[in-house]
Amino acid sequence: MPFALGQRWISDTETDLGLGTVVAVEGRMVTLLFPATGENRMYAKEEAPVTRVSFNVGDQIASHEDWTMTVEEVQEKDGLLIYVGVRTDNDEPVALKEVFLNNFIKFNKPQDRLFAGQIDRMSRFTLRYEALINQHQRRRNPTRGLAGGRVSLIPHQLYIAHEVGHRYAPRVLLADEVGLGKTIEAGMIIHQQLLSGRAHRVLILLPETLQHQWLVEMLRRFNLHFSLFDEERCIEAFADAENPFETEQLVICSLDFLRKKRRRFEQVLEAEWDLLVVDEAHHLEWSEEAPSRAYEMVEALAEQVPGVLLLTATPDQLGHQSHFARLRLLDPERFYDYDAFLAEEQAYGQVASAAQELLDGETLSDEAKRILASQLEGLDLSDAAARQQAVAKLLDQHGTGRVLFRNSRANIQGFPERHLNVYPMPLPEQYKTAIKVMGMMGGNGGDLQTRALRYLYPEKIFQQFEGDNATWTQFDPRVEWLLELLLSARQQKVLVICSEAATAIALEEALRTREGIRGAVFHEGMSILERDKASAYFAQQEGGAQVLLCSEIGSEGRNFQFASHLVLFDLPLNPDLLEQRIGRLDRIGQQNTVEIHVPYLEGTSQRALQLWYHDGLDAFEQTCPTARPVFEAVRDELFELLAANTGDQAPLDALLVKTRELHEPLKARLEQGRDRLLEIHSSGGAAAQQLVDKLAAEDDDTGMISFALKMFDEIGVNQDDRGENALVLTPGDHMLVSSFPGLPQDGMTITFDRNTALSRDDMALLSWDHPMMRGGIDLILGSEIGATSVALLKNKALPIGSILLELIFVAESAAHPQLYRFMPPTPIRLLMDKNGQNLGEKVAFDAFNRQLTPVNRHLGSKLVTASQPVIHGLIGKGQAIAEELKGGIVDKARAQMAQTLQQDLDRLEALKAVNPNVRDSELDYLRNLQAELHHLIDQTQLKLDAIRFIVVTHN
């Protein structure tokens, strides 16, 4: 290698040193100074791992004074290069000696890196190309955002999420019955809206008691990091911004908090949101004369926020007027007059009845034919297919079908049976004494609800007098009974739920110390991580806990459907909480009958409450949509009965009669009022099943797993296989980056298997939508990882020393999330021979890749230097070929975009003629989007992303 003082070289092994300058050439040694870091390196001249830095005509280079120039000519004098050209800031002619080049020059273009000897491993070049292909496919995928959640593939949930999540600024009422997964549907919609870029800022308003449940669900299921805002958080955030709600993109807030703090509500209103989600929307009371403060607040937000999701399990149970009020929040122009709404509903009721006859497949009555003919032009009912088509058209024109989704258990398959087992037990003397003493000491005070609650939990009364360490578990017959149940069902997983964390902790200790039963506790005093560990211990089949003991609040939002035995150690006073408890096991996908075990102490209010739930509402063995209104109607009488704690049968019998008289007609009315047309629309039918099949096929695709493992290997992430489909990832000591996106410093347990993730809250479900996968791909493509490579091709059919140049171009336009459906960054691969012919279409990447042998960076640099002029020429020819191919890609994307959006527009315009629920803003949005995307597709640019230089050898 001819070295000369002042020449600029770059280290092949320590590229972060920047540009080096030759400062000494003595005998067989050469010394380089790297001014950027102030370090010296001495090398043997013959084997120095360095590459000469030389630029070419057309390159832009920077001087040590930070001005840049465009090279027009390269001269050489005494072994030193002089770059002649013009400055980019003032167009003055200039000559720059290489010794005055900027020491911090970075080689960002792949060709510059190749010629500067910054050559990467061949495996990283492969990883980069695969990352481009995978990114391209994912961004075009219509199910993007659906597959990534830790959720079961349940047809109706996926259908609703897909249908709503793809809309611009969706405004809908999600009104599935309890247990059908409204929170999951909302989470999937939010996830899609965020990933697609349709939304960036999301506000969720909830009752205070549900805040943590939503926080955990959004994080655990969808990897969405919401922030919980209360007064303390607002004060804290005030240091960073005048409006605290502008410091986070994803916010959860209590509606009650905003109602009490007017200034905070004004700040929420001033912050700009893309999507508003309101849970328990049936609590928003409205009348034309006097709407509630909570309703007015949501109304004010709904007027400003483009997208609104309202969640309620009771769309019409609380009366038609409140149902109208919620629809009015979504579209006040459409639902402007209550009387007009009632008239329309009545007319629609006739259509729904006619549709019911159509669905039942019976001979249509004359009235039904008349109604259907008035709704559908050219009505054809000749065969089953024609009837199905008629139903499909009715669905599209459906009264509130675009804004309201409602599924009931009656129209959704896959729920298990529920079976109640009750165990009456004598009231221990210790409890009798404690209750008597409390009465003598005047401890029966408090409001009606407080007194009703007191006698449901006699262990708390006992502790009141004996202290917190009182060992009630030694004499309470429910504890002995629970021990026997667990010992008799050693192979069964048992979930125990009680109202208080202290009860769960005491029970776990009693089970462990008396019989060595393996258990775990799960309560609100534990951190999310501690709860995850307890949940994972319970889920473990080998060596896991047999029993999980949960408090009321601790169990919110968790599903344990791998267990089928539920022990209700005590009963909640609220029927919604009872259903929530049973819902931990009673889920779609539960394989067995859910065995519900209820022990109670005779002669106490525990027995009265158990009978009220079972004989009055049938709430143990069936979901009870009437429970809430019936509970509100008999609340005072129920509380009086429980507070009396006498065990008298007469008042209990009277209450049971009254409860049934309210429950049965209301249940019949709800069943009769079921909107079959709406349910068919909401469940998705065949379209929903197609979605499930598509996502299941994606789950079975091993391509994502092999790419993920390859990515972790190349970046330097440690992987430890723990069995049971689990892999522990931890940051490696020699990673290419200081931290891997989404990977905590203490590591993370992941699985690629959906079923494993559903039963193990301590594991992350890795999918293409997971932040680690998206972040990993962005990390690779946003850096120079794998941008250059050199390889040998052993092929005796080709002349030795022949060269090939593999060029990876990317065609891309401005980053617009809506554009990705049609024109995501698109890789164009060329394989150029020495004559400038493209062999890329004839020689597939994978097959070619398997024939190549990697070379080390030093040898690779020498091979590149020897062929530099040829490589330059091939890059120029490749650019011209890629431009031509880009034209075809752009034309195809433009045509697909125009066709897709025009179809959407035509359908909505036709629908608007018969269904007023299509908003003008949706039509305007599509028209504007069409024009904007047309312009962006025309602006598509080409960039060279990666180069691989290949030399043919016969050895």
Swiss-Prot record:
Regions crossing the membrane: none
GO molecular function: ATP binding; DNA binding; helicase activity; hydrolase activity, acting on acid anhydrides
Source domain of life: Bacteria
Its EC number(s): 3.6.4.-
Domain Helicase ATP-binding: 163-333
Keyword Repeat: no
Enzyme class: hydrolase
Domain Helicase C-terminal: 478-642
Biological processes annotated in GO: regulation of DNA-templated transcription
Chain positions recorded as ATP binding sites: D176, E177, V178, G179, L180, G181, K182, T183
CDD domains, per database record: DEXDc_RapA, SF2_C_SNF
Cited function: Transcription regulator that activates transcription by stimulating RNA polymerase (RNAP) recycling in case of stress conditions such as supercoiled DNA or high salt concentrations. Probably acts by releasing the RNAP, when it is trapped or immobilized on tightly supercoiled DNA. Does not activate transcription on linear DNA. Probably not involved in DNA repair.
Entry-linked NCBIfam families: PRK04914.1
Quaternary structure, from the entry: Interacts with the RNAP. Has a higher affinity for the core RNAP than for the holoenzyme. Its ATPase activity is stimulated by binding to RNAP.
Recorded family membership: Belongs to the SNF2/RAD54 helicase family. RapA subfamily.
Full protein name: RNA polymerase-associated protein RapA
Biological source species: Aeromonas hydrophila subsp. hydrophila (strain ATCC 7966 / DSM 30187 / BCRC 13018 / CCUG 14551 / JCM 1027 / KCTC 2358 / NCIMB 9240 / NCTC 8049)
Phylogenetic placement of the source organism: Bacteria, Pseudomonadati, Pseudomonadota, Gammaproteobacteria, Aeromonadales
